[in-house]
From Swiss-Prot:
CDD domains: LysRS_N (cd04322). The lineage of its organism: Bacteria, Bacillati, Actinomycetota, Actinomycetes, Mycobacteriales. This is Lysylphosphatidylglycerol biosynthesis bifunctional protein LysX. Its EC number is 6.1.1.6, 2.3.2.3. Residues 1-618 are annotated as: Phosphatidylglycerol lysyltransferase. NCBIfam families: lysS_bact (TIGR00499), PRK00484.1 (NF001756), PRK02983.1 (NF002821). The chain crosses the membrane at residues 38-58, 77-97, 101-121, 126-146, 164-184, 219-239. GO terms for cellular component: cytosol; plasma membrane. Residues 674-751 bind DNA. Keywords: Aminoacyl-tRNA synthetase, Antibiotic resistance, ATP-binding, Cell membrane, DNA-binding, Ligase, Lipid metabolism, Magnesium, Membrane, Metal-binding, Multifunctional enzyme, Nucleotide-binding, Transferase, Transmembrane, Transmembrane helix. GO terms for biological process: lipid metabolic process; lysyl-tRNA aminoacylation; response to antibiotic.
Length: 1114
């Protein structure tokens, strides 16, 4: 995308004056507010009538009487005058646009007519004149009352210019008309021909036809009226045309914009183009947001989103609309993002998708693959010709080389003027643009074959500003530069590149597809036709080859009736249409600051943070964020932190290990000297003595600071220096208080960490569950129960590991990133590796890799590790959790049952010293449950039958199972087989209501794709599930080792996955190939470690995790 250097001046600057009226305000009286529109409508209808009877003799005949009445008493209504029809029409449009000069003209005109009617009514006793005078008094009164509603300005000096245009135009028209009358006089006498031409062209047909003794040919009257209409049209347009913004950026304006971009520009790919210096700018009153714009054809055209703080966008938009309303400009926006378009839409603008911006994500960009074949071939072809790419920041390019780059960019431009407005900077080589990137294609002989210049897009992106290639350079130079930029972008910290904006991208893409409708094809054909001049399709084709991400961009405008004018104004601004300019030069300089009136709020200028040369504000002087708003207690602690620093006290010192833990200190004999460290939980100051409570992970101890031991100054310093929550080190001797409480009698202390936030209520702690999860560190610091749960978890995990190790199992680690998700029926998380441009899954189970190790000969192997399943979150589910999987050769699922029970019982001993678990009792308090000995074992179908009170077995027909489901309101899908329906019944009737740990065995084969069929019972698999208190704790199989059967089952699973079942497994060819090398008969065990901890401790899954997943902050 190239930048536009050609813009246009206006005669006068559009400089707002305070106070500015807001759109739609004025008197704020609803009826008076509509006066401009009503006046415009009435005069508009009248102008149409004048036009119609001027060209139609029949209509003129029928309206002769009312026309003469209106013409005599109310408003000039000549019988034939196209020029008058045009004048009234322009006056109507100006009134509807609230132009103040139109109000003056209409009011003065009515006043003059009123004076005439008053004189006639007095001298001639004319009742009609008197009635008309009364009506005109009322109309004039309404106009005077509604004067504040006519606030739109026209250009300064427009009246004198319009008068000059009118005089010259009428003189030329009269002379041409006189010549025509002389050529075609008709019955008009010689002495009346000049007057006839003068009357018809300049006198607005004030003299009626009856005052002349003859007539010229009919077509002459039409031409004479046309001459007058042209002159009046030019004059009235000169008079009524809207003020055109002549102002542009000043140095302070650009400096403020750069400050806003530094703070808020990371998400706006077009933001840097706001510094284009031939644009004007309007700021929010706070200076925290701004809109850059240009005025073309009476349209105030903003470019892209507002710059700055999104919270201040509405205020900037309001100021922009007020400015446009003041000068009668229609408002429109080119290239707004979805966020920006939403803000403009809330301000009353209509939004229309204009096209899409092409975004390259450089970490995902790769030349491999079928879709990139065209780019890859072009790059290879150019590289073979010895072309290389050089990429530098503008600030690193020597001045003479930059001058040559500018010369080449001008020489290789294929149009007279540079195109671009919303996505073009309009300058090269400016010292303030040092962060811009220059990409050059360099031929073997050192000549430059192509140039790209890209502007910053936040700290990690760039946006294409200028693209040039040497006419004789080989095809593919641009592809080489873009691909090299994308593949080497990490050297410049670039992760995203914004390429050209493709107008109507979806039309080109969808209109060329098979099956596109006729309307879409016609629309595409029209765009292709205009692409001969405006390169619409070429921009799309040049971008789509890179497989970019398409981000929609929008056109915003006030009124559908203005859409054509807005579109034409946009074409003018972007350089697609060049209009002739008269008077002053039509160009505005995009290289220098030509603005004469700074738009930046005076408060920002007064802060002396802005630079008149346009550079970004200095550090600390720009309107930068001050961080989060701090509560008062935090501010007090921050002040105390600063005070400590001023006193030379380091609130975060280097380590000095304590001599004892708190528990060790408490157990030490009286008089023992100790040094402990922990968090200060309580302070009680009694003047001469201060009591405090310090806690480390092992326990709490009371600290006693006695004035008699340390002195008055030091005891005061202790009370003043520390706050609750601070980390402290205290040294002293173990002793007792006067009331006999064991205490550490402090001699020395120091702060090891200043806590900047107050602790929660010392009795209630963190009562909100979400806060407890989000601030887990606080909960653990003050909540002993939470600490005991984590201790129990650690004991359980260590016990599981030690128990398996003691049985001869080897612990291994298998990949977490996997190319195929398998080993369980669950929805996976998807991620992407940039190095190989490959989609990967976070594992849902380690099973298939552990079985590969079984094939390799590891007879006893286990893993304890994290797995990830994209499922719901509740008291027993977390998206990531810890699993234990163990495999033993020459074993089966029955031996795994014994192993599982013993592992859990041993873990309970590690946590509590006995084979007990904790469960909530009726009152919510935890009670002990003995889990020693054997646990119940039932088949799945037997458990379902007991709940239903009817016989259910693996042979029960599907229709009977469906009938039972309907009877007990158990949902199922019509496509499920009998095994799936039976398992659904088990989950609803059995699993949810099981309490004491129970093994359920022999599940349907169709629901166990990795399990060996039961050796004696057809239709079921050698599998069990362990359930306790409604939670599935683990499962075990006699593993399926037949590779042919396993391939068939996984193929069925992959077909389900292809059909949309996201929980079905994919076909893992590598695993099947390993299985084909033979795996011994194996028993496999899988157990949820988090759920085992839940079972033993009686907590929820969130309580047993150090950091469970928390909801996003609102």
């Amino acid at each position: 995308m190239s930048a536009s250097t050609e813009t246009h001046h206006a005669s006068e600057a559009a400089v707002p004056t305070a106070p500015r009226p807001r759109p739609g305000l004025g008197t704020k009286n609803g009826r008076l507010h509509q006066v401009p529109h009503i006046a415009g409508l009435i005069l508009g209808v009248f102008s149409v009538l004048v036009f119609l009877w001027s060209i139609s003799p029949v209509l003129r005949y029928y309206v002769h009487v009312p026309r003469e009445y209106v013409d005599t008493y109310y408003f000039d209504a000549p019988d034939t005058s196209l020029s008058w029809a045009l004048v009234v029409a322009l006056l109507a449009a100006a009134l509807a646009s609230r132009k103040r000069i139109a109000w003056w003209l209409l009011t003065i005109y009515l006043v003059l007519f009123l004076i005439t009617n008053v004189i006639v009514s007095i001298t001639d006793k004319n009742v009609n004149a008197m009635a008309a005078a009364v009506v005109q008094v009322v109309l004039i009164g309404i106009l005077i009352a509604a004067r504040p509603e006519f606030y739109t300005r026209v250009r300064r000096g427009a009246g004198w210019k319009a008068l000059g245009v009118l005089i010259v135009g009428l003189a030329i028209g009269t002379l041409l008309g006189w010549g025509l009358v002389e050529l075609f006089p008709g019955t008009l006498p010689q002495n009346e021909r000049f007057l006839w031409a003068l009357n018809r062209v300049t006198a607005l047909a004030a003299a009626d036809n009856e005052q002349f003794t003859g007539r010229p040919h009919g077509f002459v009257n039409t031409l004479l009226g046309l001459f007058g209409a042209i002159a009046l049209l030019a004059a009235v347009i000169t008079l009524f045309r809207a003020q055109r913004s002549h102002n542009a950026l000043t140095g302070n304006d650009e400096s403020a914009l750069r400050g806003l971009l530094l703070q808020y520009g990371a998400d706006d790919s077009l933001g840097y183009f706001a510094t284009r210096r031939d644009k004007a700018v309007v700021f929010a009153p706070s200076g925290k947001a701004a809109i850059t714009y240009r005025v073309e054809l009476g349209v105030c055209l903003a470019s892209g989103d507002p710059i700055g703080d999104p919270e201040a966008w509405p205020h900037a938009i309001e100021e922009w609309q007020a400015l446009a309303s003041q000068y009668g400009w229609a408002t429109a926006v080119m290239g707004a993002s979805e966020t920006g378009a939403t803000a403009y839409n809330k301000a009353g603008l209509t939004v229309l998708q204009l096209g899409d911006e092409a975004i390259l994500r450089t970490r995902e960009f790769n030349l491999s693959g079928r879709d990139m074949r065209q780019v890859r071939q072009a790059v290879t072809r150019v590289r073979r010709q010895g072309v290389t790419v050089r990429i530098r920041r503008h600030r690193d390019v020597p001045a003479e080389e930059m001058a040559e780059t500018i010369r080449l960019a001008d020489a290789w431009r294929d149009t007279e003027t540079e195109r671009g407005f919303s996505m073009a900077l309009g300058r090269l080589g400016d010292r303030l643009d040092g962060d811009c990137l220059l990409v050059e294609a360099v031929a073997e002989d050192g000549e430059i074959d192509g140039i790209l210049s890209l502007v910053p897009w936040g700290p990690t992106g760039v946006s294409l500003d200028l693209m040039r290639r040497k006419p004789t350079s080989p095809n593919g130079v641009v592809e080489l530069m873009v691909s090299e930029l994308a593949t080497t972008s990490d050297q410049f910290g670039i992760t995203k590149v914004s390429l050209n904006f493709a107008v109507f991208r979806s039309v080109f893409e969808e209109g060329s597809r098979i099956g596109a409708g006729p309307i879409l094809r016609i629309w595409r054909s029209i765009l292709v036709f205009f692409s001969r001049w405006w390169q619409l399709e070429a921009l799309y084709r040049s971008n789509v080859k890179y497989q970019p991400e398409w981000v929609p961009r929008f056109l915003c405008f006030e009124d559908n009736r203005e859409l054509l004018r807005v579109g034409f104004a946009s074409a003018v601004a972007e350089g697609f249409v060049t209009l002739p300019r008269f008077g002053r030069s039509g160009t505005r300089d995009a290289l220098e600051h030509t603005g004469t009136h700074a738009a930046v709020p005076a408060a920002l200028v007064a802060a002396e943070g802005l630079h008149s040369d346009g550079s970004a504000p200095g550090e600390g002087l720009a309107p930068t964020a001050t961080g989060p708003k701090r509560p008062e207690q935090v501010r007090v602690r921050l002040d105390k932190l600063a005070g400590l620093a001023e006193q030379g006290i380091d609130p975060y010192p280097v380590a000095y290990p304590p001599s004892h833990t708190v528990t060790e200190a408490v157990e030490s004999p009286e008089g023992t000297t100790v040094r402990i460290a922990g968090r200060l939980l309580r302070i009680r100051d009694y003047g001469g003595v201060v009591f405090a409570v310090v806690r480390d992970w092992s326990g709490d101890i009371q600290i006693l600071v006695d004035e008699a031991r340390v002195g008055t100054d030091r005891i005061r310093a202790f009370a003043a220096e520390f706050d609750l929550g601070d980390l402290v080190e205290v040294a002293g001797v173990i002793g007792y208080s006067r009331r006999g409480a064991l205490s550490l009698l402090a001699n020395e202390w120091r702060m090891t960490g200043k806590c900047l936030h107050p602790l929660p209520d010392k009795w209630k702690g963190l009562s909100d569950p979400e806060t407890r999860v989000r601030q887990r560190y606080v909960d653990l610091a003050i909540n002993s129960d939470a600490r005991r749960l984590l201790e129990a978890r650690s004991a359980v995990v260590k016990s599981l590991r030690d128990s398996l190790g003691g049985r001869g199992f080897l612990e291994v680690e298998t990949p977490i990133l996997q190319q195929v998700h398998g080993g369980a029926n669950a929805a996976p998380f998807l991620t992407h590796i940039n190095a190989y441009n490959l989609d990967l899954y976070l594992r849902i189970a380690p099973e298939l890799y552990l079985k590969r190790l079984c094939v390799a000969g590891m007879e006893k192997v286990f893993e304890i590790g994290r797995v990830f399943r994209n499922e719901g979150v509740d008291f027993k589910h977390n998206p990531e959790f810890t699993i234990l999987e163990a495999y033993e050769a020459h074993s089966d699922y029955e031996k795994m049952m014994v192993l599982c029970r013993e592992l859990i019982q041993t873990a309970a001993i590690a946590a509590y010293g006995r084979e007990i678990i904790m469960r909530p009792g009726p009152d919510g308090a935890l009670v002990e449950v003995d889990i020693s000995g054997e646990w119940p074992v039932k088949t799945m179908h037997q458990a379902v039958a007991e709940k239903l009170g009817v016989d259910v077995s693996p042979e029960t027909p599907l229709t009977e199972l469906q009938r039972l489901c309907d009877e007990h309101e158990i949902p199922y899908q019509s496509t499920w087989d009998a095994g799936a329906v039976a398992q659904e019944m088990y989950e609803h009737l059995v699993e949810d209501y099981t309490e004491f740990p129970t093994f359920y065995t022999n599940f349907p084969t169709s629901m166990s794709p990795l399990t060996r069929p039961h050796p004696t019972i057809p239709g079921v698999a050698a599998k069990w599930d362990l359930v306790a208190w409604g939670v599935e704790l683990g499962t075990a199989y006699s593993e399926l080792t037949d590779p042919v059967d396993q391939r068939n089952r996984l193929t069925e699973q992959s077909m389900l996955a292809a059909g949309g079942d996201e929980e079905a497994m994919e076909l893992d060819e590598d695993f099947l190939q390993a299985l084909e090398h033979a795996m011994p008969p194996t028993g496999g065990l899988g157990m949820g470690v988090d759920r085992v901890v839940m079972l033993i401790t009686g907590g929820s899954i969130r309580e047993t995790l150090a950091f469970p997943l928390a909801k996003p902050r609102q």
